[in-house]
Amino acid sequence: QLVHTQIDLEMSFCDEEDVFAIVEGIISAAFKAVNGLEVKGPFPRLSYDEAMERFGSDKPDLRFGMEMRDLTDLVTESDFSIFREVCASGGRVRGLAAAGCAHFSRKETDELADIAKIYKAKGIITLKVEEGQVKGSVAKYLSEDAQRGIVKRLQAADGDLIIMVADDPEVSAISLGQVRRFLGRKLGLIREGDYKLLWVTEFPLFEWNPDENRWEAKHHIFTQPREQDLPILESDPAGVKGRLYDLVLNGVEMGSGSIRINKPDLQKRVMKIIGTTAEDAERKFGFLLRAYEYGGPVHGGLAIGFDRLIAVILGLENLRDVIAFP
């Protein structure tokens, strides 16, 4: 497509390490050609679970810190009803410390709450750190041990603003992650010309669709599950991780790929979990399943959005500035 350029790799007899090595070489060459920067591999790696726990995003921006922490165990027994109810229902209380932001006005904290609400959170809870103690309307409901534990876990210091979200596990992570992202820009924590690359790996293979009351493939149905998860494929789809990986640059997904299924029996198992009948599998994918009966090589790949990559390297916000026919 003239309006969109993609570098698509399809490789046989490969594993993740082979794909990573080739892509890191491509990215290093692109940086050198576009702006003369030396970017060397191997790039850092985070599992999907770790990225969500620490940054509230599957494409985290590593150009600044302000990492999130799970505070659930510290507030489970608190007298604050919201904390207690969220913990009892299996939710999570997560927090971060915004350095030097205890002076934030009500208008500024309301702005943070509005961002969290966009991502389905009911709101935020804020505490200020003064002389090693937390101050705020919720502080009186927290024991001294809980207060000290929160300050220690978040590595908060005097003058910091502690921001917490108590909600469903996914909502609390994503909404607080977006607050973190906003603060990174608002506080000027991102240096111009700074580039942070990483791989995010081991995404969930399936996600639940409550509207249709069934499992769906999080990316696509041809992704190979991790071998250690095969025993729980049918019994615990939520716990199955795929051999999936994304390349992330400065909080933007640059490319996505996976190691594919190459065995017909495994492909049929995955199809069955998402509700594909044997008849539909044959009608839609019979050619593929029959081909695998003859033996297909282990294969995988990745696709890089070339225009997006160049835009981020050049520090441009709009893809129209780098494509041939905008």
Model-derived segments and spans:
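Class II aminoacyl-tRNA synthetase catalytic cores and aaRS-like
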Residues: 1-326
